[in-house]
Amino acid sequence: MMKNLFEQSRSHWVRYDHYELKTAEDGKRYITPGKSAKPDVYNPLKEVPNIVLDALNVGMLMMGRKPEAEVEKAIMEFITRYGLLGLMTALPTTPSFMDYEAVYLPKNHFIKEESMATDKYLSLFYPFDQLDLVKKGIESTWNVSGDRTMIALTMTFMDEPMAKNMSFQREYAEPYEWVAQQFKDWAFTLTTAILYYNDYDSIDEDARGLYRKAMAAFGGIAPSYHIELLDKPTIYWDFHSLLLGIQMMFSFMLVDGDQPLRLCKNCQKVFLGSRSNAAFCSPRCKNQYNVYKSRSKKGGNEEE
Protein backbone atom coordinates (compact mmCIF):
# COMPACT_ATOMS: atom_id res chain seq x y z
CA MET A 1 0.00 0.00 0.00
CA MET A 2 2.77 2.43 1.02
CA LYS A 3 4.78 1.75 -2.13
CA ASN A 4 1.69 2.11 -4.31
CA LEU A 5 0.67 5.38 -2.65
CA PHE A 6 3.89 7.11 -3.69
CA GLU A 7 4.28 5.35 -7.04
CA GLN A 8 0.97 6.87 -8.15
CA SER A 9 1.96 10.30 -6.85
CA ARG A 10 4.06 13.20 -8.01
CA SER A 11 5.42 16.41 -6.60
CA HIS A 12 8.37 18.67 -7.27
CA TRP A 13 11.17 20.46 -5.46
CA VAL A 14 14.40 22.21 -6.42
CA ARG A 15 17.91 21.15 -5.41
CA TYR A 16 21.20 22.79 -6.38
CA ASP A 17 24.34 20.86 -7.23
CA HIS A 18 26.40 22.72 -4.63
CA TYR A 19 25.64 24.29 -1.24
CA GLU A 20 27.89 26.08 1.21
CA LEU A 21 27.90 27.09 4.86
CA LYS A 22 28.24 30.87 5.22
CA THR A 23 28.42 33.03 8.32
CA ALA A 24 26.32 36.22 8.37
CA GLU A 25 27.23 39.51 10.07
CA ASP A 26 25.33 38.47 13.21
CA GLY A 27 27.57 35.37 13.51
CA LYS A 28 24.79 32.95 12.56
CA ARG A 29 25.63 30.17 10.10
CA TYR A 30 23.44 29.60 7.05
CA ILE A 31 23.18 26.97 4.32
CA THR A 32 22.81 28.54 0.87
CA PRO A 33 23.42 27.51 -2.78
CA GLY A 34 26.94 28.22 -4.03
CA LYS A 35 27.45 31.28 -6.27
CA SER A 36 27.50 29.32 -9.55
CA ALA A 37 25.41 26.35 -8.36
CA LYS A 38 22.97 24.92 -10.91
CA PRO A 39 19.34 24.17 -9.97
CA ASP A 40 17.59 20.90 -10.78
CA VAL A 41 13.83 20.24 -10.52
CA TYR A 42 13.03 16.74 -9.24
CA ASN A 43 10.22 14.64 -7.74
CA PRO A 44 10.88 13.95 -4.01
CA LEU A 45 8.26 11.18 -3.98
CA LYS A 46 10.52 9.14 -6.24
CA GLU A 47 13.11 9.26 -3.43
CA VAL A 48 10.93 7.39 -0.90
CA PRO A 49 11.97 5.66 1.36
CA ASN A 50 15.60 6.91 1.21
CA ILE A 51 14.78 10.60 1.69
CA VAL A 52 13.02 9.78 4.99
CA LEU A 53 15.64 7.27 6.17
CA ASP A 54 18.43 9.75 5.37
CA ALA A 55 16.66 12.55 7.28
CA LEU A 56 16.11 10.30 10.31
CA ASN A 57 19.70 9.06 10.30
CA VAL A 58 21.02 12.64 10.28
CA GLY A 59 18.86 13.28 13.35
CA MET A 60 20.07 10.06 15.00
CA LEU A 61 23.67 11.34 14.79
CA MET A 62 22.60 14.26 17.00
CA MET A 63 20.58 12.02 19.33
CA GLY A 64 23.73 9.89 19.69
CA ARG A 65 25.84 13.01 20.44
CA LYS A 66 28.20 12.39 17.52
CA PRO A 67 31.00 14.94 16.85
CA GLU A 68 29.81 18.24 15.33
CA ALA A 69 31.99 17.73 12.22
CA GLU A 70 30.26 14.39 11.49
CA VAL A 71 26.80 15.93 11.95
CA GLU A 72 27.65 18.93 9.75
CA LYS A 73 28.96 16.67 6.97
CA ALA A 74 25.77 14.56 7.09
CA ILE A 75 23.51 17.65 7.00
CA MET A 76 25.34 19.12 4.00
CA GLU A 77 25.22 15.77 2.17
CA PHE A 78 21.46 15.57 2.75
CA ILE A 79 20.87 19.14 1.52
CA THR A 80 23.00 18.53 -1.60
CA ARG A 81 21.06 15.35 -2.35
CA TYR A 82 17.54 16.70 -1.73
CA GLY A 83 17.65 20.52 -1.44
CA LEU A 84 16.91 22.92 1.43
CA LEU A 85 13.89 22.19 3.65
CA GLY A 86 11.81 25.21 2.60
CA LEU A 87 11.50 26.55 6.15
CA MET A 88 10.35 29.96 4.91
CA THR A 89 7.11 28.51 3.51
CA ALA A 90 6.81 25.69 6.09
CA LEU A 91 6.56 27.86 9.22
CA PRO A 92 3.73 30.37 8.48
CA THR A 93 0.02 29.51 8.58
CA THR A 94 0.00 29.77 4.77
CA PRO A 95 2.73 29.54 2.12
CA SER A 96 0.93 32.44 0.37
CA PHE A 97 1.95 34.88 3.11
CA MET A 98 3.11 37.43 0.50
CA ASP A 99 -0.59 38.07 -0.24
CA TYR A 100 -1.15 39.34 3.31
CA GLU A 101 -0.02 42.41 5.25
CA ALA A 102 2.01 40.37 7.75
CA VAL A 103 3.27 36.84 8.33
CA TYR A 104 1.28 34.78 10.86
CA LEU A 105 3.06 31.94 12.63
CA PRO A 106 1.66 29.00 14.59
CA LYS A 107 3.73 27.65 17.50
CA ASN A 108 7.12 26.42 16.31
CA HIS A 109 10.65 25.74 17.58
CA PHE A 110 12.30 28.62 15.78
CA ILE A 111 10.31 31.86 16.04
CA LYS A 112 8.55 32.98 19.23
CA GLU A 113 6.46 35.77 17.66
CA GLU A 114 2.91 34.93 16.56
CA SER A 115 3.08 37.48 13.75
CA MET A 116 5.87 39.40 12.05
CA ALA A 117 6.26 42.18 9.49
CA THR A 118 6.89 40.58 6.08
CA ASP A 119 10.23 42.33 5.45
CA LYS A 120 11.50 41.30 8.90
CA TYR A 121 10.46 37.69 8.25
CA LEU A 122 12.09 37.64 4.80
CA SER A 123 15.35 38.99 6.26
CA LEU A 124 15.64 35.73 8.26
CA PHE A 125 16.11 33.86 4.97
CA TYR A 126 18.04 36.43 2.90
CA PRO A 127 20.95 37.39 5.20
CA PHE A 128 23.46 37.95 2.36
CA ASP A 129 21.80 39.20 -0.85
CA GLN A 130 18.28 40.61 -0.96
CA LEU A 131 15.82 39.93 -3.77
CA ASP A 132 14.63 42.93 -5.81
CA LEU A 133 11.29 43.08 -4.03
CA VAL A 134 8.83 45.86 -3.21
CA LYS A 135 5.91 45.18 -0.86
CA LYS A 136 3.16 47.67 0.00
CA GLY A 137 0.32 46.30 2.09
CA ILE A 138 -0.93 43.19 0.32
CA GLU A 139 0.68 44.14 -3.01
CA SER A 140 4.09 42.67 -3.91
CA THR A 141 6.35 43.30 -6.88
CA TRP A 142 9.37 41.10 -7.49
CA ASN A 143 11.79 41.80 -10.33
CA VAL A 144 13.89 38.90 -11.53
CA SER A 145 16.61 40.01 -13.91
CA GLY A 146 20.11 39.18 -15.12
CA ASP A 147 20.62 35.48 -14.62
CA ARG A 148 18.86 33.43 -17.32
CA THR A 149 18.78 30.31 -15.15
CA MET A 150 16.99 32.16 -12.34
CA ILE A 151 14.50 33.72 -14.77
CA ALA A 152 13.74 30.28 -16.26
CA LEU A 153 13.32 28.80 -12.78
CA THR A 154 10.93 31.61 -11.79
CA MET A 155 8.87 31.08 -14.95
CA THR A 156 8.62 27.34 -14.21
CA PHE A 157 6.89 28.06 -10.89
CA MET A 158 4.78 31.07 -11.90
CA ASP A 159 1.58 29.35 -10.67
CA GLU A 160 3.03 28.60 -7.24
CA PRO A 161 2.84 30.89 -4.17
CA MET A 162 5.33 33.72 -4.66
CA ALA A 163 7.25 32.82 -1.47
CA LYS A 164 7.82 29.24 -2.66
CA ASN A 165 9.20 30.55 -5.94
CA MET A 166 11.42 32.99 -4.04
CA SER A 167 12.81 30.17 -1.88
CA PHE A 168 14.16 28.44 -5.01
CA GLN A 169 16.43 31.39 -5.82
CA ARG A 170 20.20 31.31 -5.23
CA GLU A 171 20.00 34.12 -2.65
CA TYR A 172 17.80 32.03 -0.34
CA ALA A 173 19.44 30.64 2.83
CA GLU A 174 18.32 28.66 5.87
CA PRO A 175 19.81 28.97 9.39
CA TYR A 176 22.01 25.92 9.97
CA GLU A 177 20.80 25.50 13.57
CA TRP A 178 17.16 25.44 12.47
CA VAL A 179 17.82 22.80 9.83
CA ALA A 180 19.75 20.69 12.36
CA GLN A 181 16.95 21.04 14.93
CA GLN A 182 14.38 19.80 12.41
CA PHE A 183 16.37 16.61 11.74
CA LYS A 184 16.69 16.09 15.50
CA ASP A 185 12.93 16.54 15.97
CA TRP A 186 12.17 13.83 13.40
CA ALA A 187 14.62 11.40 15.06
CA PHE A 188 13.08 12.19 18.47
CA THR A 189 9.62 11.34 17.11
CA LEU A 190 10.82 7.99 15.79
CA THR A 191 12.66 7.02 18.99
CA THR A 192 9.58 8.02 21.04
CA ALA A 193 7.40 5.65 18.99
CA ILE A 194 9.92 2.78 19.13
CA LEU A 195 10.64 3.14 22.86
CA TYR A 196 6.93 3.34 23.68
CA TYR A 197 6.26 -0.12 22.23
CA ASN A 198 9.59 -1.65 23.31
CA ASP A 199 9.22 -0.49 26.93
CA TYR A 200 5.42 -0.70 27.17
CA ASP A 201 5.36 -3.53 29.74
CA SER A 202 8.18 -2.14 31.86
CA ILE A 203 6.91 1.46 32.28
CA ASP A 204 3.98 2.77 34.32
CA GLU A 205 0.91 4.52 32.96
CA ASP A 206 2.30 8.01 33.75
CA ALA A 207 5.38 7.33 31.62
CA ARG A 208 3.18 5.93 28.84
CA GLY A 209 1.12 9.11 29.01
CA LEU A 210 4.26 11.23 28.53
CA TYR A 211 5.24 9.19 25.47
CA ARG A 212 1.74 9.59 24.01
CA LYS A 213 1.80 13.33 24.69
CA ALA A 214 5.19 13.70 22.95
CA MET A 215 3.84 11.77 19.98
CA ALA A 216 0.62 13.80 19.76
CA ALA A 217 2.72 16.95 19.30
CA PHE A 218 4.00 15.54 16.00
CA GLY A 219 1.89 16.67 13.10
CA GLY A 220 1.64 19.25 10.40
CA ILE A 221 -0.57 21.16 8.02
CA ALA A 222 -1.76 18.59 5.49
CA PRO A 223 -0.61 19.43 1.96
CA SER A 224 -3.23 20.04 -0.69
CA TYR A 225 -3.35 17.82 -3.77
CA HIS A 226 -5.06 17.46 -7.13
CA ILE A 227 -5.40 14.70 -9.72
CA GLU A 228 -3.57 14.95 -13.03
CA LEU A 229 -4.46 12.83 -16.05
CA LEU A 230 -1.02 11.69 -17.18
CA ASP A 231 -0.44 8.21 -18.69
CA LYS A 232 -2.74 7.18 -15.80
CA PRO A 233 -4.56 9.20 -13.09
CA THR A 234 -1.87 10.57 -10.76
CA ILE A 235 -2.11 12.33 -7.39
CA TYR A 236 -0.09 15.54 -7.53
CA TRP A 237 0.87 16.69 -4.02
CA ASP A 238 1.32 20.44 -3.64
CA PHE A 239 4.15 20.46 -1.10
CA HIS A 240 5.05 24.07 -0.40
CA SER A 241 8.12 22.93 1.52
CA LEU A 242 10.30 19.84 1.44
CA LEU A 243 9.87 19.75 5.22
CA LEU A 244 6.13 19.17 4.85
CA GLY A 245 6.73 16.54 2.18
CA ILE A 246 9.16 14.60 4.38
CA GLN A 247 6.83 14.95 7.37
CA MET A 248 3.96 13.42 5.39
CA MET A 249 6.07 10.57 3.95
CA PHE A 250 7.50 9.90 7.43
CA SER A 251 3.98 9.79 8.91
CA PHE A 252 2.86 7.16 6.39
CA MET A 253 6.02 5.12 7.00
CA LEU A 254 5.59 5.36 10.78
CA VAL A 255 2.17 3.67 10.63
CA ASP A 256 3.10 1.11 7.96
CA GLY A 257 2.87 -2.37 9.47
CA ASP A 258 4.31 -4.20 6.44
CA GLN A 259 7.69 -2.46 6.45
CA PRO A 260 8.07 -0.83 9.87
CA LEU A 261 10.73 1.75 10.68
CA ARG A 262 13.23 0.17 13.06
CA LEU A 263 16.43 1.14 14.90
CA CYS A 264 19.41 -1.19 14.50
CA LYS A 265 20.37 -2.73 17.85
CA ASN A 266 24.04 -2.60 16.89
CA CYS A 267 24.72 0.67 15.01
CA GLN A 268 21.57 2.70 15.87
CA LYS A 269 20.86 3.27 12.18
CA VAL A 270 17.22 3.67 11.08
CA PHE A 271 16.11 1.06 8.56
CA LEU A 272 12.96 -0.49 7.10
CA GLY A 273 12.26 -3.83 8.74
CA SER A 274 10.91 -6.78 6.80
CA ARG A 275 8.93 -7.65 9.96
CA SER A 276 7.88 -5.83 13.13
CA ASN A 277 10.53 -7.42 15.37
CA ALA A 278 13.49 -6.87 13.00
CA ALA A 279 16.43 -5.81 15.19
CA PHE A 280 19.38 -5.39 12.80
CA CYS A 281 19.88 -3.37 9.62
CA SER A 282 22.21 -5.98 8.09
CA PRO A 283 23.60 -9.50 8.69
CA ARG A 284 26.96 -7.82 9.43
CA CYS A 285 25.46 -5.82 12.31
CA LYS A 286 23.76 -8.94 13.66
CA ASN A 287 27.09 -10.83 13.65
CA GLN A 288 28.98 -7.93 15.24
CA TYR A 289 26.36 -7.60 17.98
CA ASN A 290 26.47 -11.33 18.76
CA VAL A 291 30.30 -11.32 18.84
CA TYR A 292 30.36 -8.39 21.31
CA LYS A 293 27.65 -10.05 23.38
CA SER A 294 29.49 -13.38 23.64
CA ARG A 295 32.77 -11.58 24.42
CA SER A 296 31.20 -9.58 27.24
CA LYS A 297 29.63 -12.77 28.61
CA LYS A 298 33.03 -14.50 28.50
CA GLY A 299 34.67 -11.52 30.18
CA GLY A 300 32.05 -11.59 32.91
CA ASN A 301 32.56 -15.32 33.53
CA GLU A 302 36.35 -14.96 33.69
CA GLU A 303 36.06 -12.22 36.31
CA GLU A 304 33.96 -14.53 38.43
Where do the PLM segments sit?
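Short helix-coil boundary/hinge micro-motifs
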Residues: M1-F271
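BZIP DNA-binding basic region
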Residues: I246-E304
